Regions:
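Residues on the lipid-exposed face of transmembrane beta-strands in outer-membrane beta-barrel proteins
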Residues: 1, 24-30, 81-87, 117-121, ...
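Sequence/structural signature of outer-membrane beta-barrel proteins
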Residues: 3-15, 40-47, 100-108, 133-144
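Solvent-exposed loop segments that connect transmembrane elements
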Residues: 11-13, 46-74, 139-157
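Conserved anion-binding
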Residues: 17-37, 41-46, 50-62, 66-68, ...
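Residues that define the transmembrane beta-barrel architecture of outer-membrane proteins
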Residues: 18-22, 29-31, 75-81, 111-115, ...
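Repeated loop/turn-to-beta-strand initiation elements of outer-membrane beta-barrel proteins
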Residues: 32-37, 43, 87, 91-97, ...
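A mid-sequence, solvent-exposed acidic-amphipathic segment
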Residues: 59-110
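Outer-membrane beta-barrel "beta-signal"
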Residues: 121-126, 154-170
């Protein structure tokens, strides 16, 4: 079981509602491959009628969309499937693969698949990596408007990305 706790974080629309989420999960591992399924016992990050029901998203121009809006209801029972693997492709070089599928109950347009394909290589005590990450999430629901006063620009956080990393295990 895992619990996501966001102290003092609440929705502005319905201030009593929080983002906190409880999930139970089961996973299996075979050699270098893993599969895990997480099931939400609570509303997924607080999503329900009073917090996001009826929301239509943000258009590329920063204006509120008015069609194809979200439904209503509880998001309890949402789930996430996580498939991953690591393969040695050369001496000291590993290929990491990930595919995930988020299902959001009652709010199907928020459901998405995500993926990551990357290479890592240790250099002494540090591992360096490079990866391509992406998703098929509907951009109108995964945009944010910067907090700059008067700004109408939006950022699509559901687009293809490239990640460079450096990590050290203690």
């Amino acid at each position: 079981m895992q619990y996501y706790w966001y102290p003092r974080a609440r929705y502005n629309i319905d201030p009593g509602d929080r983002y906190n989420t409880a999930e139970v999960y089961v996973g299996v591992r075979y050699d270098q491959f893993t599969a895990k399924y997480s099931y939400a016992l609570t509303n997924l990050f607080g999503m329900k009628t009073g917090t996001i029901g009826g929301y239509c998203g943000i258009g590329a121009d920063g204006s509120a969309a008015t069609t194809n809006c979200l439904g209503t209801g509880s998001s309890r029972g949402s789930g996430y499937l996580d498939l991953a693997g690591t393969l040695d492709v050369a001496v000291g070089v590993s290929l990491g693969l990930h595919y995930g599928r988020q299902y959001v109950r009652s709010y199907a347009p928020l459901s998405y698949a995500d993926y990551k394909i990357g290479l890592t290589r240790p250099f002494g005590a540090v591992s360096l990596g490079a990866a391509v990450v992406g998703t098929d999430a509907e951009s109108r629901f995964y945009r944010y408007t910067p907090t700059t006063a008067g700004s109408q620009e939006t950022e699509n956080v559901a687009r293809l990305g490239f990640v460079l990393s450096a990590s050290k295990t203690f």
